């Protein structure tokens, strides 16, 4: 039962991360698009509710509750007898069934249909200041610091500020290749 609880906690973490990554479209992170499985919110037309991640978190809560009941059942044993074994078995088997069904549903109706929100991801990549580290080998630390400070103060991208500072486009393309940063060994 403890191992099932660990699975439930892990699934909750994954489901909550997907809910946050899919939040939006304008006020959330909006890094991914979750499959639209039903009409959106009655108060917010166009919103995609993360129904499958929400189901997974509810199932996980039940499995965690079942684990607590099993634990209490285990406390009730006296010598070789424990009249709580039927309840413990029911909750254990119930948790197995719930997790199996929720995992299958999660994979088929949510995870398999996730799409990256490329426009948002590219905008985030262009606006991140942490990419200034990639400029160091090309223009040096001090100059990279000047560029990142100006980008932070002005709200502009590193590329824009660096271009205005006279760094050529070829150098910027080489330094600020986000796909290469994400997969430095080409994998």
Question: What label would you give each PLM region?
Answer:
Residues 1-17, 89:
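Helix-rich catalytic cores of soluble enzyme domains
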Residues 16, 23-187:
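Catalytic-core signal marking the mid-to-C-terminal active-site face
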